[in-house]
Each structure stands twice: as C-alpha cells, then as structure tokens.
C-alpha cells in the first residue's frame, strides 16, 4: 500500500475520475471512514472454510448429501458444541435435521407425541449451532445469507449476548411465538439452510459434473443456487458445453455415452432434445441387426428388452456418425495432429478386418451399411439430416443453454485460489518434464499459455454468433479438449473409442496417460509447475481430480510430499470397485487442510429415516500454528486495494478536490 503522506497531487489528480465515481458510493468523509473501519475489521477475521469436490459424474444423491453435510463439518461442529450435553442419538438426529430439515420433520411430526416440545428444544439447539457456525463472520456477511421471511428473527436470536432477565424473556417469547403461531417447521427449515451455507464459505467443483450418472442437471441446479461456487471444467463437462454450442462431434459423443449407459432420459425428458429422428433412423437402418456390441450397460430391471434393443440401435447409429464427424474435424485441423485416429479408411470392408500399427485385427461387428468404403467419412443424406436436427435441438434447449452458460460464467480450465492451483486433469508435459506444446493458428503455445488460449477459444465457440470461422474453430477446440493429447482435461495420448467397440484384443484399447501423472509424484517437477503458475512453493498445492485414486491397492491421494492432492476416488458407483471407497473431498479452513475419504452413500431416503450419514475418515494434511486470516487470502488482497482507494478518496475530500455531498 502506498504511503498516503507521500502521495503527490499529480498522482491524486490522475485518479480523480475514478475517485469521483467512488464518491457516489461513499459521498462523505464519515461514510468513507466507516467503510475503511469495516474492511480493516474483516481483514482480521479467520479465513472462511473452502470445500473441494470433484468427479461427481451425475451422481446427484451423494453429491447433494456431501454438500449438505460439508464433508462432515456440520457433524464435527455439533460434536464440539454439544459434546457432553446431549446424547449421541440426539446429535445424529440434529445432524439429519440440518441436512434434510423438511423431509426429517415430515417423519418426526408423524412419530412425535408432543411436537411443540420437540420444536422448542431443537430451535434452541439450532440457534446455538448457527451462532457457533457464524462466529468467524461479520454480521453483514451472515445477514446476506439469511432468508427474507426470517431475517429479523434469526438476527435477533443470533446476536443475543446480554444476559439479563428481560433479554432472556424477550428471546424466550420469540421462540414461544414461533411455535404458537405454527411456523416452527418453516423456521427450522430456514435456519438449517443457513447453517449449511455458513459451514462452507466457498465451494470448488473441480470438474466432471456430467458423465454416466443419472441427473447432472440436478447438480447444476444446486450449484446455481449456491451462495459462492466456482467450477474447473472436466472433460465430460466440456463435451456437453461443446454440444450446447452446436459442435456436431460433441453432440454425437454426448449421445453415444448417454445411450451406452441407458441414460437418454436426461437428454430427452430433462433437456427436451428430440431424439425421434435418431430413433427412427436407427430402427430403419439397423432393423435386423442385434447391435450386440452396443447393448447398453444397465442394471435397472425396469428397462425392458425392447427398450434395450432400441437403445442399442440408437447407440450404434450415433457411434458411426461420431466416427465420421471426427474424421471431418481431424482433416479440417491438421494442427491437431490426430491423423492416426482416422481409422475408417484402415478397414478392409471385404474381409472385415482393420490394420493398426502394422497388425491386422478382426472386427467384432462388420455390419456397417452407412459406410461407403470409397469415402468412409462421408455422411449419408439420412445421417446428415439426423445430426442437423440434433444440432438444432441442442442449441434450442433452454435448460441446457442455461446450464452451460452457468458453467462458462462460473467456470474455467484452471483456477488459482488462495495459493492453490485447481485443475481437473493435468498440465500437459513431455517425458522429460518440459511443457507439451501445440501449434494454434500458426503460433506455439505451452503450459499456462496453452491452457489460457484453449479456454479463450472455447468461449468464442460458445458465445460468438456472427463470426462463423472463429466460432467453428472454438467449437473444434472444445472437441479437442475432450479427446486431444495436449488437452489438460483429457490427459491421455489417445481416446480408443472405436477399438473398444470393434476390436476384441485389449492391447488396442490402451490409452497412455500424460507423463504429468507419473511426474506429479516428484517434488522437483511440482516446483516447475508452481513457477509456471506463479505459486509459492512453501504455501501452495495443486489439487486434481480426473484419475480415480485406487485406495484399496494402497495408492495415496497425497503426492510429492503433500504438494499435490488428488481428490477423485469414486462418486461414480462404476469406479467404486476400482477405488474401494466413494471418493475424496478436501476441506481448507483457517488452521488446517483436511483430506476426507468417504464410504459409499446408499440413499437420501435411508439417511433421513435411519439418521445414517456417509462414513468419512479425515486426515489432516497440514496444520498451521498461526491461523490464516482474511488478510492472507485473495479476497484480502482485493479488500486491501479497496481500502487504499478509500484512503485516496478521503485525501481528495480533505484537499477539496472532491466535495462532500
């Protein structure tokens, strides 16, 4: 901060235009002075709690539960506050009440003989818990989180500190009135929601909201409602973002994955995308084809044989369209260096074989009626009609456009937050640890610059409406971010989708991870990454998701002596056999950095009825002897800049350069 005594009149005059604008907000010396005092006080509060979650993969129930319980933070605060004063069964009930207030109260009302007594006891407990959770925040910050209909009442109850007979009677009368006039249920729901918000100051979602899970839309809706959230895009997110932009290969990939996991409901029922043209085409083209390799992976017994058969045909139809469309992009963008993924022209259609890397393999499925062996990447007129209609549907889906707009507004490829670097996948590296480079529009990019450029192009692909060439390039980059070797979201050399469908030999299915994933075990390699992103070696961490941590095989989520933390591990049920757990989350408060591992979550219904919580184990990765204050955070830097501006405004008032209003 500049020494204000040494500020010259010339410097002050150079800032005058901005200071005059600031004076509209603080029109007097007293108002500017009061704001400086308030901001200085905020700087000396403990930093808020940050919550890190990654790789949700559409599994909305465990995600919503972890969001509600703050990865165990609420349960911990209940234990700290009521340790020996209430029974364990009451603590469990209170925690469930905070997580699911409306549903839990519906059950309790049916069971409880004296519901008014229950209301009184638990309103007092919830007020104490809310006080405890809000203790490190300013009144104004807490006020912003309060619901309008109960704002005054909750504020009065939270800030009851004067112990006098009259005051105690006053607060008791508030609680009695809440119960007597029949709004106790609504009040408990309101204050429980406030507690959920207070325990986590900021939520970081490090990618892959979308994938095979049933309801990514619920997850996005919850994030839209969240008071403070940021998102680092995952490869599955960018796929849907590209699809919403109208990028045909992204649309085909998104539909293929949805069909593969019998999850087309999200496409048709939730996002309102018309799949009839695809279904009609698939039935006509593959009428007598069992599409054995394309039967959806589904455990739901309610899916009929007829439905599976239709989905298999749609799955095959969109897969072939995808391979053709990808060929178009690869040939259009030689700088993507993906010519080796042009596989349709490597097929011997007469013999039903394919030649890969000098070796011939038998195809598992040779019924390919829409492929012209002389021009295998050419879409038939019917296929072109199907994809054109799908583009129109994806672009016209109001809900999808709203969700993807939110992902762009709150999201990025990476984020620097309070000395931590958040990236879903990796920073693309070569074997020797140097940054992998890519030519984009005639210029080489690598490291941070490459990630910045790709993000900028992706935004152009979505937002540009009238610049056709720029929009097309941006859309192609979104597909590349899904599948390209220099993509920080994908982090592999190849995506062997074709091989997995058509070739039995698993040697062809292999996808080699970027060297980053091996080198991130090395502290020296981390040092280079920290330098690239201007991070302090002693204070910083890189936080990744993307690759499941195989805990059951002894793999640790803590890499490079604690410099890198990997918090993917199994929100998706499909990965839980590999990981042995149901994922990691991370909690970063003013004193500690805590890694939390979770056991599988059954259902919200069971959690409400049986007061069962996700079993979680917490490991303290770091413990600071000195508490981290707001002053030490990114927000603190902004506040200090604001204070400096206000002090300049004070000087301008005192020198008469700006008149008080």
Curated annotation (Swiss-Prot):
It comes from the Bacteria. Its EC number is 3.1.3.11. GO terms for molecular function: fructose 1,6-bisphosphate 1-phosphatase activity. GO terms for biological process: gluconeogenesis. Disulfide bonds: none annotated. Its cofactor is Mn(2+). Gene3D superfamilies: 3.60.21.10. Pathway: Carbohydrate biosynthesis; gluconeogenesis. Keywords: Carbohydrate metabolism, Hydrolase, Manganese. It catalyses: beta-D-fructose 1,6-bisphosphate + H2O = beta-D-fructose 6-phosphate + phosphate. Belongs to the FBPase class 3 family. This is Fructose-1,6-bisphosphatase class 3. It comes from Clostridioides difficile (strain 630) (Peptoclostridium difficile). The gene is fbp.
């Amino acid at each position: 901060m500049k020494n204000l005594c040494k500020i010259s009149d010339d410097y002050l005059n150079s800032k005058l235009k901005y200071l005059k604008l600031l004076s509209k907000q603080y029109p007097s010396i007293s108002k500017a002075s009061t704001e400086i005092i308030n901001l200085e006080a905020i700087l000396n509060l403990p930093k808020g709690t940050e919550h890190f979650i990654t790789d949700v993969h559409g599994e909305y129930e465990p995600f919503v539960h972890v969001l509600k319980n703050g990865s165990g933070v609420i349960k911990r605060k209940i234990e700290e506050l009521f340790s020996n004063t209430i029974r364990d069964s009451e603590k469990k009930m209170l925690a469930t009440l905070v997580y699911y207030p409306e549903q839990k109260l519906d059950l309790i009302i049916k069971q409880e003989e004296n519901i008014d007594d229950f209301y009184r006891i638990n309103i007092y407990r919830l007020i104490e818990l809310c006080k405890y959770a809000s203790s490190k925040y300013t009144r104004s910050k807490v006020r912003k989180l309060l619901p309008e209909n109960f704002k005054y009442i909750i504020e009065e109850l939270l800030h009851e500190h004067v112990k006098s007979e009259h005051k105690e009677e006053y607060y008791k009368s508030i609680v009695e009135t809440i119960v007597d006039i029949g709004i106790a249920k609504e009040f408990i729901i309101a204050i429980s929601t406030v507690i959920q918000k207070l325990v986590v100051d900021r939520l970081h979602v490090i990618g892959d909201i979308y994938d095979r899970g049933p309801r990514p839309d619920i997850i996005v809706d919850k994030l839209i409602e969240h008071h403070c959230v940021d998102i680092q895009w995952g490869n599955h997110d960018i796929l849907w973002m590209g699809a919403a932009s109208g990028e045909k290969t992204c649309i085909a990939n998104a539909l293929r994955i949805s069909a593969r996991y019998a999850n087309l409901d999200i496409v048709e029922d939730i996002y309102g995308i018309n799949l009839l043209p695809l279904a009609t085409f698939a039935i006509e083209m593959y009428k007598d084809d069992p599409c054995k390799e394309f039967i959806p992976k589904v455990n739901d017994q309610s899916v009929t044989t007829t439905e599976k058969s239709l989905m298999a045909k749609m799955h095959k139809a969109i897969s072939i369209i995808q391979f053709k469309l990808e060929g178009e992009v690869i040939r259009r963008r030689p700088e993507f260096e993906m010519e080796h993924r042009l596989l349709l022209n490597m097929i011997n259609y007469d013999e039903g074989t394919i030649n890969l890397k000098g070796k011939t393999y038998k195809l598992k499925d040779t019924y390919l009626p829409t492929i012209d062996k002389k021009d295998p990447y050419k879409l038939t007129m019917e296929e072109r009609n199907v994809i054109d209609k799908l583009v129109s549907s994806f672009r016209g889906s109001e809900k999808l456009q709203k969700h993807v707009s939110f992902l762009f507004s709150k999201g990025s490829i990476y984020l620097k937050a309070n000395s931590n670097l958040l990236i879903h996948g990796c920073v693309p590296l070569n074997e020797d640890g140097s940054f992998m480079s890519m030519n984009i529009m005639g210029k080489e990019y690598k490291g941070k610059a490459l990630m910045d450029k790709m993000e900028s192009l992706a935004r152009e692909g979505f937002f540009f409406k009238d610049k056709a060439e720029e929009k097309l390039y941006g859309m192609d980059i979104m597909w590349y971010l899904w599948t390209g070797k220099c993509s920080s979201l994908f982090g592999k050399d190849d995506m062997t989708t074709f091989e997995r469908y058509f070739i039995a030999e698993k040697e062809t299915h292999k996808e080699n991870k970027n060297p980053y994933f091996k080198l991130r075990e090395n502290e020296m390699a981390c040092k280079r990454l920290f330098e690239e992103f201007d991070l302090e070696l002693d204070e910083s961490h890189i936080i990744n998701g993307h690759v499941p941590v195989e805990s059951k095989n002894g793999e640790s989520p803590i890499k490079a002596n604690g410099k890198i933390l990997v918090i993917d591990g199994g929100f998706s049920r499909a990965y839980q056999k590999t990981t042995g757990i149901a994922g990691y989350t991370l909690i970063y408060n003013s004193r500690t950095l805590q890694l939390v591992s979770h056991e599988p979550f059954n259902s919200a219904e069971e959690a409400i009825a049986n007061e069962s919580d996700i079993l979680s184990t917490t490991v303290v990765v770091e413990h600071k002897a000195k508490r981290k204050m707001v002053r030490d955070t990114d927000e603190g830097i902004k506040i200090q800049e604001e204070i400096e501006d206000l002090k300049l405004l004070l000087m301008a008032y005192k020198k008469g350069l700006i008149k008080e209003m």
